[in-house]
From Swiss-Prot:
Domain of life of the native organism: Eukaryota
Classification of source organism: Eukaryota, Metazoa, Chordata, Craniata, Vertebrata
Biological source species: Mareca falcata
The reaction(s) this protein catalyses: a ubiquinone + NADH + 5 H(+)(in) = a ubiquinol + NAD(+) + 4 H(+)(out)
Membrane-protein topology: Multi-pass membrane protein
Gene that produces this protein: MT-ND2
Protein name: NADH-ubiquinone oxidoreductase chain 2
Any one cellular-component term (Gene Ontology): mitochondrial inner membrane
Biological function: Core subunit of the mitochondrial membrane respiratory chain NADH dehydrogenase (Complex I) that is believed to belong to the minimal assembly required for catalysis. Complex I functions in the transfer of electrons from NADH to the respiratory chain. The immediate electron acceptor for the enzyme is believed to be ubiquinone.
Length: 346
């Protein structure tokens, strides 16, 4: 791909995201979603590998179907109520259609099948965009219409996402697939609290985006596409691998790391809303994903692969870790003491 095309595509992604999150009219929001879809497809398929082309095709087909559903739900609402305002989504059928459309765009269960396959066929930095930036516009639409959505439906989808995201990630050896199922599991936490506390859902997404970005950037630095490549990277980049372990434990939600904050606040809010069984269920289901985070963390720091031949060990990394990776990793590990202030600001 032409090197000058990448900045144009990234700017288009920023433009599409900005249009969607700042719009009040359904057609403008839909336009932003379409700009995003068209801008990310060349980034997915830029390696010209058959798997990358397949991933781009799958992504295009699912996103096109979801965008058509968004447009159809807004037209149904406009037909019934005469309103094109995003916050005035009052028709029950429109709410159901929009929930399905956004679930497809986000990769929530039961519309999750495309997401791990697309991430597996994408380069690591494109997978980072798909897991974070590309989820922000659809999530914004859900937040703007949260008062009209069905809480029971969202809770069911959230619990199913947390269960399936943890369950399907257990036997994976590819790092991108592990992070795809991690994303599905975290979306479950966001969806379960969305109706009751939209601001807390947004805070959870922000923290998830910070932690996932740190993991993807670390994996990109050590060029680790599967667990065996993570194993061999310890002698080359020991500091980065140790940091990766801490960020993965934070992503798992272990105290005293940043990732514990959203889980703690969500369980607290669900208990206030008298949804203790749902809080207990999603807390127990997070133990499934904890297992594969621990396995990835164990591979990144503790074990070295057996090797019978003599070879020179590389004890020092040739390049220092980049500043963005260091900043994101620090935020992923150290923000828990600031949680009262962060919760008050958000």
């Amino acid at each position: 791909m032409n090197p000058h095309a990448t900045p144009v595509l990234v700017l288009s992604l920023a433009l599409g995201t900005t249009i969607t999150i700042s719009s009040n009219h359904w057609v403008l929001a839909w336009t932003g979603l379409e700009i995003n879809t068209l801008a990310i497809i060349p980034l997915i398929s830029k390696s010209h590998h058959p798997r990358a082309v397949e991933a781009a095709t799958k992504y295009f087909l699912t996103q096109a179907a979801a965008s058509a559903l968004v447009l159809f739900s807004s037209m149904t609402n406009a037909w019934a109520t005469g309103q094109w305002d995003i916050t005035q989504l009052n028709h029950p059928t429109s709410c159901l259609l929009l929930t399905a459309a956004i679930a497809i765009k986000l990769g929530l269960v039961p519309f999750h099948f495309w997401f791990p396959e697309v991430l597996q066929g994408s380069p690591l930095m494109t997978a980072l965009l798909l897991s974070t930036l590309m989820k922000f516009p659809p999530l914004t639409l859900l937040l703007m219409t949260s008062k009209s959505l069905n809480p029971a439906l969202l809770t069911t989808m959230a619990l199913a996402s947390a269960a399936l995201g943890g369950w399907m990630g257990l036997n994976q050896t590819q790092t991108r697939k592990i992070l795809a199922f991690s994303s599905i599991s975290h979306l479950g936490w966001i969806a379960i609290i969305l109706v009751y506390s939209p601001k807390l859902a947004l805070l959870t997404f922000y923290l998830y985006a910070i932690m996932t970005s740190a993991v993807f950037m670390a994996l990109n630095k050590i060029k680790a596409l599967n667990l065996s490549m993570v194993l061999t990277s310890w002698t080359k980049t020991p500091v980065l691998n140790a940091t990766l372990m801490l960020v993965l434990l934070s992503l798992a939600g272990l105290p005293p790391l940043t990732g514990f904050m959203p889980k703690w606040l969500i369980i607290q809010e669900l208990t206030k809303q008298e949804m203790t069984p749902a809080a207990m269920a999603i807390a127990m289901l997070s133990l499934l994903s904890l297992f594969f985070y621990l396995r990835l963390a164990y591979h990144s720091t503790i074990t070295l692969p057996p090797n019978s031949s003599n070879h020179m060990k590389q004890w020092y990394t040739s390049k220092p870790p980049s500043t963005p990776t260091a900043i994101l990793a620090s935020l992923s590990i150290l923000l828990l003491p600031l949680s009262p202030m962060i919760h008050a600001i958000v």
